[in-house]
């Protein structure tokens, strides 16, 4: 099952890195579709999602040549999500999917943006950043519909 998720994450990573950089002008601020899939896969494959996050980030780092920073962020924020899900036991799974997960996504996206912006001055407007977050939210809703059974099974 982990290998299947790994292949799916790589396919989504390739698609997101081939579709969104021409639209937004760079490969650093793209929607976090593969990272969202890693977070949702944690409902099915549990702690193996950390390995999946690392490999996904490593692939992204190889494409944008950012020296392992994205893979480190993926692992840190996936671990933070897993810890928050285990510590904050919520009766309603929609709270963790629509409150904790977007918060983790926003923190990761802001961290990437701030670190990349110090290394390479990016010309990203608030509108582009908002569009990327909106795409993330739409994909979050779609993945919630797909993984609905596993989310409620955990609760």
UniProtKB/Swiss-Prot annotation:
Keyword Zinc assigned to the entry: answer is no
Q: Where in the cell is it found?
A: Cell membrane
Instruction: State the source organism's domain of life.
Output: Bacteria
GO cellular component terms attached to this protein's record: plasma membrane
Q: How does it sit in the membrane?
A: Multi-pass membrane protein
- Which keywords appear in this protein's UniProt record, sorted alphabetically? Cell membrane, Membrane, Transmembrane, Transmembrane helix
Q: Which residues cross the membrane?
A: 2-24, 62-84, 97-116, 131-148
Name this protein carries in UniProt: Uncharacterized protein aq_1188
The protein's organism comes out as: Aquifex aeolicus (strain VF5)
Q: What is the lineage of its organism?
A: Bacteria, Pseudomonadati, Aquificota, Aquificia, Aquificales
């Amino acid at each position: 099952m982990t290998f299947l998720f790994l292949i799916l994450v790589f396919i989504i990573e390739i698609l997101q890195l081939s579709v969104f950089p021409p639209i937004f002008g760079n490969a650093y601020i793209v929607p976090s579709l593969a990272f969202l899939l890693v977070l949702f896969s944690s409902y099915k494959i549990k702690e193996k999602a950390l390995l999946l996050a690392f490999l996904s980030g490593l692939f992204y780092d190889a494409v944008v040549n950012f020296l392992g920073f994205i893979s480190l962020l993926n692992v840190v924020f996936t671990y933070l999500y897993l810890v928050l899900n285990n510590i904050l036991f919520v009766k309603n799974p929609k709270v963790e999917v629509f409150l904790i997960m977007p918060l983790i996504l926003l923190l990761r996206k802001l961290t990437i943006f701030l670190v990349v912006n110090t290394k390479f001055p990016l010309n990203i407007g608030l509108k582009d950043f908002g569009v990327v977050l909106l795409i993330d939210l739409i994909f979050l809703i779609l993945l919630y519909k797909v993984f609905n059974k596993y989310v409620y099974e955990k609760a």
